[in-house]
Curated annotation (Swiss-Prot):
The gene is acmA. This is Acetone monooxygenase (methyl acetate-forming). Keywords: FAD, Flavoprotein, Monooxygenase, NADP, Oxidoreductase. GO terms for molecular function: flavin adenine dinucleotide binding; N,N-dimethylaniline monooxygenase activity; NADP binding. Its cofactor is FAD.
Length: 533
C-alpha cells in the first residue's frame, strides 16, 4: 500500500479530465489524474458498441484553447465513430504529454474530507491512498450504467452485455438470436448497426423516440481545410450559443407565418443534424401548442418512412413533445423494422419481469428465446458516477445520502458541505445534458482552474459554496426548469429512469451562454456564493 501526496487529484481522463490535468499542471501544481479504465477517453473508451459515434459535428467537439492542437487533428467524417474519437483523445493525451501524470486501471472507491487538515484522502480499489488539497471530479454525465435491472440476469445462458461495457474483442452475431432492451440514442445506434448481421433481432421498446436522420458525409482535404479555417470563429461563438453548438435559435415562432415556419422546419430537418431540435424554435421547450406542431412535423416525417401502420403505432411517440427527451440521430433506423428478421416488442404495458436461462420473460408469461441480450438501458445520469464512490464531506455527511434526498449543486461546480471538491458534468449545469459537451466541459474546467489559481494567489486554501449561495442557484435553476416542458416528461432528463431518484430537471435550461455569464460574474464578484478561507 502506498500514499501519494498531491495538490490536486482528478478523477477521470475523458474530455474534462484531460483538460483539467493540463491546466493545473500548467499552473505548476502537483496533480495526477486517475481512471479505472485501461486507456484514456472516458465515455469514448467505455462506449465501443456497434454504431457508437458523435451526434455533435466533429469540428465543434474539440478543444478550443490551442489552435495548433485543434488543427493538428483531421476528422474523416462529419460525425465520426467511436474508434476515431478514441484515437483523437489519445492524440490529445500524447500532444500535451499527459500520460506521465495519469494512473490508469486505478479505481477511486472513496474520498473523505479531513476538516482538521482541509484535505481529501482518496482510496483506490487496491488500497492505496492519495492525499490532496483539491478533489476534481471529471467522471462524466453518462458513466454509471444501469446494469442490474432484472431478476435472473446471472441465470442467462447466453451472452448479456451493457452497451457501456462492450467487450473490446466485440461480439460475433452470426446465426444469433439477439435482443436489445432499450431504444434511446444508444439503442438506436446499436439496432441499425447489427440488424443485417444477426439471425433474428428483437427490440424491446418501452418508450418510442422521435428520431432525426443523420447526414454524415466523409471529409476530404477541402472539408478539413474549411473547418480548420473557422477555428477563430468557432472559439468566439460556441461558448455563447444556447447549447454550445454552432447553430442557435434566431426566430420567434410568432414572428413567422405558417409557411415560413414550415420552411424553417424543413430546412433544419434537411440539415441532417440536431439543428431541428436545438436551433429551430425555442418555444418547443415552453409552449405546448408550438411543441405539438413541431412534434407532428417530426411524426409526419417518420410516418412517411414506415410502411406498416402498426409500426407507426409502435415507433412514433404520441404522449410527449419532441425535444423533451434526448433526440437521437439515426441512419435508416426506421427502415430496419421492415426487415423480416427484426421484430419490435412493446413492453410498456407488458413489461419485462425477469431474465431466464433461455431469454426474456414478459409479464404475460411470454418468453422470447435469445442467444445474446444487449442492455441499452442507459445510466444513472449526472449523479451515479459520484454516488457510487463513497464521498464524505463535513460532519461525516455522504454525497450518496445527500443526493438521495435532494439533488443540489452550486452551478454544477461544487456542492455545499464538500469543501475543495470541484465538479464537472453533474446536475444543475448545461453539461448535464443540453449541450455540446466539449463546449460545456471546457467552460467548467477553465472555471475550476481559475478558482484554484485565485485561491493560491490570495493565500487562501479552501473554497466551498455557502448554503445561501447554493439555495439561490437551486431556486434559479428550478424556476427555469419548471417553465420548461422537459419537467413535464418522464425521462433520464429528470431522473425518472432510476427508481427512487429525486425528481429534478438535471440540466440547466437557461442556456450555455447565460450559464457561462453567471459563473464568470460570480468569480468576478469575489466568488459570490462561495466562502474562501
Amino acid at each position: 500500500m502506498s500514499t501519494t501526496t498531491l495538490d490536486a487529484a482528478v478523477i477521470g481522463t475523458g474530455v474534462a479530465g484531460l483538460y483539467e490535468l493540463h491546466m493545473l499542471r500548467e499552473q505548476g501544481l502537483e496533480v495526477r489524474a486517475y481512471d479505472k479504465a485501461s486507456g484514456v477517453g472516458g465515455t469514448w473508451y467505455w462506449n465501443r458498441y456497434p454504431g457508437a459515434r458523435f451526434d455533435s459535428e466533429a469540428y465543434i467537439y474539440q478543444y478550443l484553447f490551442d489552435e495548433d492542437l485543434y488543427k493538428g487533428w483531421s476528422w474523416s467524417q462529419r460525425f465520426p465513430g467511436q474508434e476515431e474519437i478514441e484515437r483523437w483523445l489519445n492524440y490529445v493525451a500524447d500532444s500535451l504529454d499527459l500520460r506521465r501524470d495519469i494512473s490508469l486501471e486505478t479505481e477511486i472507491t472513496s474520498a473523505v474530507f479531513d476538516e482538521d487538515r482541509n484535505r481529501w484522502t482518496l482510496t483506490t480499489a487496491d488500497g492505496d491512498t492519495i492525499d490532496a488539497q483539491f478533489l476534481i471530479t471529471c467522471c462524466g454525465m453518462l458513466s454509471a450504467p444501469m446494469k442490474d435491472l432484472f431478476p435472473g440476469q446471472s441465470d442467462f445462458g447466453g451472452q448479456l452485455v451493457h452497451t457501456a461495457r462492450w467487450p473490446k474483442e466485440g461480439i460475433d452475431f452470426a446465426g444469433k438470436r439477439v435482443g436489445v432492451i432499450g431504444n434511446g440514442a444508444t439503442g438506436i445506434q446499436v439496432i441499425q448497426s447489427i440488424a443485417a448481421d444477426v439471425d433474428e433481432l428483437k427490440v424491446f421498446i418501452r418508450t418510442p423516440q422521435y428520431a432525426l436522420p443523420m447526414k454524415n458525409p466523409s471529409y476530404g482535404p477541402d472539408e478539413v481545410a474549411w473547418y480548420k479555417s473557422r477555428f477563430g470563429e468557432l472559439k468566439d461563438t460556441l461558448p455563447h450559443t444556447f447549447t454550445g453548438f454552432e447553430y442557435d435559435f434566431t426566430d420567434a415562432w410568432e414572428d413567422l407565418t405558417p409557411e415560413q415556419r414550415r420552411a424553417r422546419l424543413e430546412d433544419d430537418y434537411e440539415n441532417g443534424s440536431l439543428k431541428l431540435w436545438l436551433a429551430s424554435f425555442a418555444e418547443i421547450f415552453s409552449d405546448e401548442q408550438v411543441s405539438e406542431e413541431v412534434s407532428e412535423f417530426v411524426r409526419e416525417k417518420m410516418r412517411a418512412r414506415l410502411v406498416d401502420p402498426e409500426l407507426c403505432d409502435l415507433l412514433i411517440p404520441s404522449d410527449y413533445g419532441f425535444g423533451t427527451h434526448r433526440v437521437p440521430l439515426e441512419t435508416n433506423y426506421l427502415e430496419v423494422y421492415h426487415r423480416d428478421n427484426v421484430t419490435a416488442v412493446l413492453v410498456r404495458d407488458n413489461p419485462i419481469t425477469r431474465i431466464r436461462e433461455n431469454g426474456i420473460e414478459l409479464a404475460d408469461g411470454t418468453v422470447h428465446e435469445l442467444d445474446v441480450i444487449i442492455m441499452a438501458t442507459g445510466f444513472d445520469a449526472g449523479t451515479g458516477a459520484l454516488t457510487r464512490i463513497d464521498i464524505r464531506g463535513r460532519d461525516g455527511r455522504t454525497l450518496a445520502d445527500d443526493w438521495s434526498r435532494d439533488i443540489r449543486t452550486t452551478m454544477g461546480l461544487m456542492v455545499h458541505g464538500y469543501p475543495n471538491m470541484l465538479t464537472t458534468a453533474v446536475p444543475l449545469a448545461p453539461s448535464a445534458a443540453l449541450c455540446n459537451m466539449t463546449t460545456c466541459l471546457q467552460q467548467q474546467t477553465e472555471w475550476i482552474s481559475e478558482a484554484i489559481r485565485h485561491l493560491r494567489a490570495t493565500g487562501k486554501t479552501v473554497i466551498e459554496p455557502t448554503a445561501e449561495g447554493e439555495e439561490a442557484w437551486v431556486a434559479h435553476h428550478d424556476e427555469l426548469a419548471d417553465a420548461n416542458l422537459i419537467s413535464k416528461t418522464n425521462s433520464w432528463y429528470v431522473g425518472s429512469n432510476v427508481p427512487g431518484k429525486p425528481r429534478r430537471v438535471l440540466s440547466y435550461v437557461g442556456g450555455v451562454g447565460a450559464y457561462r455569464d453567471a459563473t464568470l460574474e460570480a468569480a468576478a464578484a469575489g466568488y459570490k456564493g462561495f466562502a474562501l478561507s
